[in-house]
Amino acid sequence: MTARSISVSRNGSRSIEPLWPPVLAMLAVGGLYAALPPSLVGGAPRWLPIAIVVGLLTAIVVFHYRGDHFVHQVLGHILNGLVTAAMIFSLALLIKEVTEHNITPRRLLTSAASLWISNFLIFASWYWRLDGGGPHARARTPGHTDGAFLFPQMTLPADVKLAAGEQDWEPRFMDYLFLAFNTSTAFSPTDVPVLSRWAKFLMMIQAVISLTVLALLAGRAVNIL
């Protein structure tokens, strides 16, 4: 096994991937939501969204290092659900302001950019937490051969994987972030076929949100021209 392969503990189980990439992604989502105009957050205080995100992330990290993977996963789903609902709520308010012509071009651009970036960060977290039973379940299985997404590494012959030192390859958060980014830009996965129905459903929602945000910007640009 190469130096960059997943480490193996004394009892034979592999250590889970670092937690900081998904944590940073959720902190970015909280910051982007807090930066939205008050009219797009229902009049809530600016500190409230980031406080909720930080509070839940703190608990998630604590339970992660305690080894309580069930609570860690449940809290992760709660956090994902909250930020997803908040994003859709803000998008609905943005649509309302655009249709009523109550928003300036600059505020529309910054708000749409915040929601668009939040969209692929949030859904990257969903894919990371749900695929193959979540990060802890994936870490207990040598190699990643059964999941909702068919990553290119999963299709390599065993001898090719062994020669490349990728026999124990498993997707990390960056792989799901790349998948979510492509879904937001191309409205479909590019190099990763989708196998599970739940994944197809989530990707449809993500693509619709991304398309709605871009349609708002395009419609406003046409009106300005």
Predicted features by range, described:
Residues M26-L40, V61, A92-L93:
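Membrane-embedded alpha-helical segments in integral membrane proteins
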Residues G132-D191:
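Membrane-proximal soluble regions of multi-pass membrane proteins
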Residues R10-A25:
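N-terminal membrane topogenic signal
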Residues P21, G43-L57:
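Structural signature of hydrophobic alpha-helical transmembrane segments
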Residues L48-P49, V71-V83:
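Cytoplasmic-side transmembrane-helix entry/capping segments in multi-pass membrane proteins
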Residues Y33-R46, Y65-H69:
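Short, hydrophobic transmembrane alpha-helix segments
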Residues V98-H136:
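Pore-domain transmembrane helices of cation channels
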Residues E170-L225:
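Pore domain of cation channels
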